Amino acid sequence: MASISSSAIATVNRTTSTQASLAAPFTGLKSNVAFPVTKKANNDFSSLPSNGGRVQCMKVWPPIGLKKYETLSYLPPLSDEALSKEIDYLIRNKWIPCLEFELEHGFVYREHHHSPGYYDGRYWTMWKLPMFGCTDSAQVMKEVGECKKEYPNAFIRVIGFDNIRQVQCISFIVAKPPGVL
């Protein structure tokens, strides 16, 4: 067996005591004496926040007959000119336009499970490839027209994809099947 010299033990003891003094010991939480607590019973309800008495003007979205689909679905159907302006906004922000369509459901639905998953209506079929290099809303509107012609009973949406951040930045429905509000 090897024996350890007394100078080696002294060195170990010295470093141990030095290391122990580097960190201050935990002394517990500070007392609450420095923070006085004043409880005031506030039974005066006249000082509550108010919306200025405009409650009768605020309406919620009616759930019957007017399904909310995506970003601009609370608006009346947009004209081709208004859709072109939205697409121009998308292009100005350097997002890549992409068209998708859905033949059955134009909204998120859960058919096979109650928790969200891949097959719950979020992912639609892509129409052709994303329009990299697109500089004009007329190009996108032409593709929307072709998609409508090919699938007249489909929901069609335009997506703006940011290829730098790798995220979808905007999505809105541009066409719905006839008879769907």
UniProtKB/Swiss-Prot annotation:
Sample GO molecular function, one term: ribulose-bisphosphate carboxylase activity
Subcellular location(s) of the protein: Plastid, Chloroplast
GO cellular component: chloroplast
One biological process term in Gene Ontology: reductive pentose-phosphate cycle
UniProt keyword annotation of Translocase present: no
UniProt keyword terms in alphabetical order: Calvin cycle, Carbon dioxide fixation, Chloroplast, Photorespiration, Photosynthesis, Plastid, Transit peptide
Entry-linked InterPro entries: RuBisCO_ssu, RuBisCO_ssu_dom, RuBisCO_ssu_N, RuBisCO_ssu_sf
Note: The basic functional RuBisCO is composed of a large chain homodimer in a 'head-to-tail' conformation. In form I RuBisCO this homodimer is arranged in a barrel-like tetramer with the small subunits forming a tetrameric 'cap' on each end of the 'barrel'.
Subunit details: Heterohexadecamer of 8 large and 8 small subunits.
Function, as annotated: RuBisCO catalyzes two reactions: the carboxylation of D-ribulose 1,5-bisphosphate, the primary event in carbon dioxide fixation, as well as the oxidative fragmentation of the pentose substrate. Both reactions occur simultaneously and in competition at the same active site. Although the small subunit is not catalytic it is essential for maximal activity.
Protein name from the UniProt record: Ribulose bisphosphate carboxylase small subunit, chloroplastic
Designated gene of the protein: RBCS
